[in-house]
Amino acid sequence: MLILGIDSSGHTASVALYADDVVLSEYSCNIGLTHSQTLLPMVAEIFSRTGHTVDELDAIAVSAGPGSFTGLRIGAATAKGLALGYDIPLLEVSTLEGLAMNVRDMDAVYVHPIMDARRSQVYTATFLDGQLIGEEEAIGIEELVANINQMPGKHFFLGDAVPVYRSCLEAQLSVPYRFAGPGNLLQRASSVAMLGAEQLALGKAVSGKDFHLSYIRKPQAEREREAAGLREYDITHEDPNLLKKAAGEDRLAARNYKIDAGPGYEDDTVPENL
């Protein structure tokens, strides 16, 4: 089983190739470039270095949110371009579950992936022994701390909101806690790929046409048009027409980059029909 993992939900772009319980290769890039500049070259490089080709893939696992609206769209465009071009199934992986997967081996510890949602809020969820407890949500950091203080036990935090709110957490938490180190702090495509492998075994793959992103909060443009408070937003699903309307680098992220497709393909560029 060969799976390509893609995560572009935050500042870090990450791709990984995973086969039969082994991470063959993983690249992550967080150097200030846009994901449209880094993602496809990283995908091409990972196939070149491992000697595998696109046509060998059993599936592509991609982080489907929550996260940066623009970043998620670029990852989706990349994954959909490959999936539609080479008839490869897609696997939708929660960004928060992917973060929790970084430290799944931790036993009897509440794991809290927290992503900066701005406006003093975080995207978060709680996991125990690898299982989601409750729901994914966007919540104020102080409200989150108050909730966690009502949960006896050990707690572990990771995600890009840790450096943003670390001082607040240290000042207000009354339960035992730890923070992730640099190696596990941010999103990793290998975790996305491993979760994708589990989903594929359960028959949860979808086609490129049926893949949709999920957001906990509405995009900024929609939020500005509505008067309701942020907490009132439910998880919303991507409008399939959004990718068609997206201009410039977001929509073109997966276009015309040379990737070895394997034997039998005369044109090994990613098709334009995203």
Residue ranges of each PLM-predicted region?
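Gly/Ser/Thr-rich beta-alpha loop segments that engage phosphate groups in nucleotides
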Residues: 12, 34, 65-69, 73, ...
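Surface "functional belts" at beta-alpha junctions
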Residues: 22, 34, 89-187, 215, ...
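DPxDG-like acidic metal-binding loop motif
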Residues: 63-90, 95
